[in-house]
Amino acid sequence: MSTEETVDEVPCCGSHDEAQCTIQHDLAPQPLIVEEEVNNGEKKAKIAVVGCSHGEMDAIYETMALIEEKKGYKFDLLICCGDYQAVRNHGDLPHMSIPPKYRSLQTFYKYYSGEKKAPVLTLFIGGNHEASGFLCELPNGGWVAPNIFYMGFANCIQFAGLRIAGLSGIYSHGDVEFSHYERPAFAERDVKSAYHVRNVDMFRLRQLKAANNDKLSNPIDIMLSHDWPGGIPDFGDSAWLFKKKDLFEADHKSGKLGNPALMKLIYDCRPRYYLAAHLHIKFAALVPHKGSGSERPQPTRFLSLDKPIPGRQFMQALEINVASDAKMELSYDPEWLAILKNTDLLTTADKTKIVLPDRIGSVPCVYDRKDFRPTAEEMEEITKLGDLTIKTDTFKHTAPPLKEDTSEAKNVPPSAYYRNPQSAEFCQWLGIKDLNYLLVEKSSDYVGIPFYMMPDSGETEFKSNQDEVDFGEDDFIIDRGHGSEEPEAKKSRLEEEKKKKKKKIENLKTL
């Protein structure tokens, strides 16, 4: 396939009339964005990429509209590389690791409530400034609003046949070995550890690498992380970078700049594109890969983008060839589904360090394999699941949507933790542990009734018998309509329910 390497640069001042652009840009060498010539049987997927979103969805979509008007086409997908800030209402703000005086509702709540709808399919990963209580309802990802999809702690999905892998959060040495155990109500430290990446997620992503005898392919088309891969400045103009950000050089030399495990992920999975954010500067790099003889896989084109404010380079346009019959929609990646099934034994809601199969060392071996890449037989099992298209109609409000941002709306307690129907449906369909359920079962404290189940929500027919609802009888603190129950009978019933819940939690801890 012949290619022409070009730069598709997005003006960063918000004005797309060059005559009006008064900002002088001091730029790093630009990334080589591959604009492939369209051959027979191919078309282009037009993708917009932004760095940190910071809840500025109105501004981001408005900028995209200006670009579309200038270029004369419509974007098929928007990718956001973290700090998305999916804040549903003021109750989500205490779940963000941001000093209270800097917390702001921003504009996502309008898309959650239905006041607005995202004009383009939007895909995002989490960063270190997120509404963590909401996102931990969706460990494996899901819709946070119509047309806006969160990738979960780690994921690989497909868009128009392109394989997109993502890792949410940032690196912290003290938390990387732990399980995902955090949920509201967050302890003071847990509101930070909730967004720290875990070894178990990176281990799962490494299973996406090609077969051992495959030295030439690029198994992943696009890989996303909020953090930079540790060592990435060495593959770009580091002198320019350290001149612009003088504190970066010392961190880079000491190994503290970025996630030290992500470069291995690049070498294992050889993504064609690697997109990141977090450090609020646009920076490009090119990572070559070893091949076989004179042949090599395509290099990984790394690009990190800035935050969405005037004068900063926060958006980039990509055009990537896809099959002519490719549908511009999301679908589950069959290999990733098999990896989730293979590694299901690593899922727990207990606060514990997870010993990975490839890092067993001297501890007794509890795994019967170290390589969890799916076998042909395991992939065959996935085909039995049928259509892998991600349904677009499964979103439901768990926290109450904010219809109007009034002073009264600000006076609310922190959001509860909710059982999310998307997590329940996905895990039941795939046959894996439901971390959202396990986190709910850890404690009945701060577990709320999802808004869509409320009788006055207008989103569902209220059922007085909650056993008929998908989640069963033990998931929520609810009034089951026992009417004018005698005090002694009520006391006896509550004691029995308390015993049942305690026993159920103890049973889960043994899994």
From Swiss-Prot:
GO MF annotation list: metal ion binding; RNA lariat debranching enzyme activity
Q: Tell me the cofactors it needs.
A: Fe(2+); Zn(2+); Mn(2+)
Q: Where is the composition biased (Basic and acidic residues)?
A: 477-498
Q: Which InterPro entries has this protein been placed in?
A: Calcineurin-like_PHP_ApaH, DBR1_C, Dbr1_N, Metallo-depent_PP-like
Query: Which EC number(s) does the record attach to this protein?
Result: 3.1.4.-
One cellular component term (GO) for this entry is: nucleus
State its location(s).
Nucleus
At the top of the EC hierarchy, this enzyme's class is hydrolase
Q: How is the cofactor bound?
A: Binds 2 divalent metal cations per subunit.
Annotated positions binding a divalent metal cation 2: D83, N128, H226, H278
User: Where on the tree of life does the source sit, at the highest rank?
Assistant: Eukaryota
Q: Where does a divalent metal cation 1 bind?
A: C52, H54, H280
Q: Name one GO biological process term.
A: mRNA splicing, via spliceosome
Q: Which controlled-vocabulary keywords does the entry list? A: Hydrolase, Iron, Manganese, Metal-binding, mRNA processing, Nucleus, Zinc
Region of interest (Lariat recognition loop), residue spans? 168-198
Major localization listed first in the record, in broad terms: nucleus
Outline the segment boundaries, as ranges, of region: Disordered: 473-511
SUPFAM superfamilies noted in UniProt: Metallo-dependent phosphatases (SSF56300)
Q: How is its activity regulated?
A: Active in presence of diverse metals including Fe(2+), Zn(2+), Mn(2+). Binds two metal cations in two adjacent alpha and beta metal-binding pockets.
Q: Give the record's family classification.
A: Belongs to the lariat debranching enzyme family.
Q: What does this protein do?
A: Cleaves the 2'-5' phosphodiester linkage at the branch point of lariat intron pre-mRNAs after splicing and converts them into linear molecules that are subsequently degraded. It thereby facilitates ribonucleotide turnover.
* Name of the molecule in the record: Lariat debranching enzyme
Q: Which gene encodes it?
A: dbr-1
